[in-house]
Each structure stands twice: as structure tokens, then as C-alpha cells.
């Protein structure tokens, strides 16, 4: 039995969307295109045909409403999967902005994914990525709590980290990026693929999350009856 409890409607709506897709999409290829690629008109067509009829009202309302303040005007959230799902989150937007800054300065961060070993990754980091953190504008952004929030760091935690580092947040972020890009092989490091390539390894399908692997698809689908989800606090569950 697997019980997911979360007060955050956004988190649970994505979980429920994945569960419905896992159960009702015709095969692994369709599932991978929906959540691995996460873009293209075909995702919306498959949502309407296979997934939407099986969503609860709360989840359906979430995906078919807008992220804009009124929720009634603006593009629907499900449209994220047409435009590029992984670009829509605050983290995705921050990564996209970082790549834009890189292009403006003539840097292609995706090249680190082609490094064959740790020494090549380290050399690329020192030549291309490390200088990025010496940019005055980038250092200013790194000191801003909004940047931390985009990375999933709550403001209170950001303040603690800032105090612990004695205001050296740019150096802290620089070391985290170095660790991500240098200390782990790129073959199965899907976090690095998203950060430096803004995608998963679609060609080899090695640097992808376990739930997207074809060899796990049948087992996951078979265990769906054991899963239940609740939008509630743990104290009230």
C-alpha cells in the first residue's frame, strides 16, 4: 500500500495526472512522450482521449484552469505539455534564463553532457561554467531570495544558508553546480541533463527517472491499485 499525503494541490494534481496516464495511456511510448518529452500537440490530444475522463474533479479543474490570478482567463495549465512542460516551473524558467545568458555570452552549457570522464567535465566547468558565477549580474541574482525560491529553497531556509555562508551565496550555488556537473557521470545523471541540456537523454534513455523506464512500466501499472492520494495535512489524515 502506498499512501501519498500532501497539502499542496499542485503537487498532488501532477501525481494524479501521472497515475491516470500510467493506467490509461495505451503503452509506454505514449507515456514517455507525455512525461519524458513533455511537449507537442499530441500530448493534448492524448490527454483529452485517454486521461481526462478518468480524473477526479479537483485534478481536472487544476489542469484545465489558468495559473493566472483569476484562474478563469489565460492559458490552461494542461497546455504546459504542448509548449514544453519542463520549461514552465519556476526552476525551468530559471534554467531557461541561465541558458539565455549563456548564449548572449557565447557559451553552450549543453556541451558538458558530451564529456567522457571526470577530468573532461572538470576542464569544461573551469573554462565555461565557473566564469559564469563571476558575472556581477549573476552574483546579484544569487543573493536574491527569489532566485532561491525558484530553486525550491524557501525564504526562511535561504536566510539560514545566507547566514551560514556569511553572505557568500554565489559561491554556494557555484559549488552546487560544480558538484552536479563534475562529480557524477553524465550517463545516468538526469538532473544534470535537465540543468545543462534542458531535457532528458531521449536517445539512449539512460539519464531518465526510474518511473519513465520502459522496463518498469508494466510493474508500475500493475501496482496502481495499491496507490491512494490525499490532499490534506498529515495531522488531519
Label each PLM-derived region with a short phrase.
Residues 208-236:
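Adenosine-cofactor binding site in Rossmann-like domains, unifying the SAM/SAH pocket
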Residues 10-217:
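Class I S-adenosyl-L-methionine-dependent methyltransferase module
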Residues 2-6:
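Conserved SAM-binding motif I beta-strand of class I
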